[in-house]
Every structure is written in C-alpha cells, then in structure tokens.
C-alpha cells in the first residue's frame, strides 16, 4: 500500500497545485520545505507526514480528506 499511496497523495497534491496555478516553489515556501521535496512528494518518491498533509491542506484550501478521496483502500468497507 505504501508506494501506491504515496503516488496517490502526490497526484492529488499536483492536481490541486496546478488547479490553483501555483509553482512547486510557492508551495514549498508555504510549508517550509525545498521545491525538490515537493517534487518528490508529487512523484510519490517520498511519503508525506500527517503534519505536512495538514499544512498542505491549509495552504491549498482543501479539507485534509481531499488527499484521501478516490483512494481504493479508503473507499472499501
């Protein structure tokens, strides 16, 4: 689950960032990481901690659940 989940989170991050017209650098500055770290998040190379998910959700103006929606394991009984 880990690798697929990381890719899912990264995909959701990238979709929202692009929808808002933000650069990786702007997002990185907002949560105090490097733009390279945002790249790794978006590719699913690195996992995203719960603290970072909360920071990202706040900055990207989405509920935390946004990152988990559409993930198969989340929707199963």
Task: Name every feature range the model reports, one short phrase each.
Residues 21-40:
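Short alpha-helical DNA-recognition segment
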Residues 11-26, 55:
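Short basic helix-loop element that most often maps to the first helix and adjoining turn
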Residues 68-77:
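Short, charged recognition helix plus adjacent turn
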Residues 3, 42-43:
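A generic secondary-structure micro-motif detector
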Residues 1-8:
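A detector for short, charged/polar N-terminal pre-domain segments
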Residues 11, 15, 29, 40, ...:
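DNA-binding alpha-helical recognition surfaces that contact promoter or target DNA
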Residues 51-66:
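DNA major-groove recognition helix of helix-turn-helix/homeodomain DNA-binding modules
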């Amino acid at each position: 689950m880990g690798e697929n989940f990381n890719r899912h989170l990264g995909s959701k991050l990238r979709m929202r960032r692009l929808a808002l017209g933000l650069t990786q650098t702007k997002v990185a500055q907002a949560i105090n990481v490097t733009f390279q770290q945002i790249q790794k998040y978006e590719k699913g190379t690195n996992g995203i901690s719960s603290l970072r998910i909360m920071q990202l959700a706040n900055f990207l103006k989405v509920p935390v659940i946004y990152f988990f929606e559409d993930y198969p394991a989340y929707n199963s009984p």
